Amino acid sequence: MEHFYRDTWVEVDLDAIEQNVTNALRLYKDREMNLMAVVKANGYGHGAVEVSQAALRAGASYLSVAFLDEALALRKAGIDAPILVMGLVGAEHVQLAIKHRITLTVYQLDWLEQAISRLHTRDKLAIHLKLDTGMGRIGLRRKEDIRSCMDFIASHECFELEGVFTHFATADEKDLTYFKKQCQRFNQWLEYIREWQLPIRYVHCGNSAAGLRFPEKNFNMFRFGIAMYGLTPSPEITDELPFPLKQAFSLKSRLSNVKKLPKGEGISYGATYVTEGAEWIGTLPIGYADGWIRHHSNAGGHVLIDGKRAPFVGRICMDQCMIRLPKKHSIGDTVTLIGESDGKQITMDEVAKRLNTINYEIPCVISWRVPRIYFRDGQIISVKNNLL
């Protein structure tokens, strides 16, 4: 087991990952459904390898990532499950994808033409065709472009059209007008694609929001991303979720210094905070280089220590920050920045709200200077320290 030597760390509850996957699949117990675990961005900052293993253990049958390097990292770690790269992979890398059994996303005729020149007669490249039904990001948008790609795929046996998919832009909102428009487009284009009579194994359109809110809108696969980590796709639909999500990510630190300062003393760079009386000030060994950005300095944020809230004071430094303690504490006492402490909780949603962002971003930006500790059944099963 790896070790780490700093007093700031992330705890990842793999039981939470597995519980969220299990509960999601139960929604589809009466019909065939494949759950694709989305582990891009290093598993949303949780750790792609460990999250993949937990998700597969709980019943996921497919993994997805953003780019080829992420897929290769999973293969290097010994993960054998099917992997879809959802972003663009250069056509020059198709042999690498075939060698490592990695499925690629296709949405350009030019790409298909470039790829075929690099494929051999007996090669089989698994692909998923991406349709842009309203996200405006990547994907085929016009019927004539779909026709051109389908004609090319159908006439070259090197391509195995394993799947067709799209992505919803507003499935996590109360207003479903645009969502329904995308559903309609996808159904129409899917019907058109079926005219080529190719054996398409997977059809997927649902993300976490659509997969949990609208099981009837999903085909035989949905992509389980943010909710797998126990985070709601958006606060406005929390009351519509079919089961409570269990947050897997906690961020903790230990006091590295404690001092009592008199009234009128400045704290941190610029002395932007001045003590209002005699105050106990604690220092934490975490800063913006760890992803705990400077905006925490003036956003009204707190930590938990012994279940009590303590506010940040002064500017966040590169490697350290300061808090105002409710009483005298000892160096080495544990402080919770995200997670639970003595029955109290600071959620990812709370942190995101004070930073005027979304919960997705928070774990993703906690840098890999911060080691990850993985728990199952309340016991540490592994430690990941990317610095050593």
Swiss-Prot record:
Active site: 40 (proton acceptor), 269 (proton acceptor)
Presence of the UniProt keyword Membrane in the record: no
Pfam families in alphabetical order: Ala_racemase_C, Ala_racemase_N
GO molecular function, one term: alanine racemase activity
Catalytic activity as recorded in UniProt: L-alanine = D-alanine
Entry cofactors: pyridoxal 5'-phosphate
Top EC class, one word: isomerase
UniProtKB keywords: Isomerase, Pyridoxal phosphate
UniProt record similarity statement: Belongs to the alanine racemase family.
Purpose: Catalyzes the interconversion of L-alanine and D-alanine. May also act on other amino acids.
Protein name: Alanine racemase
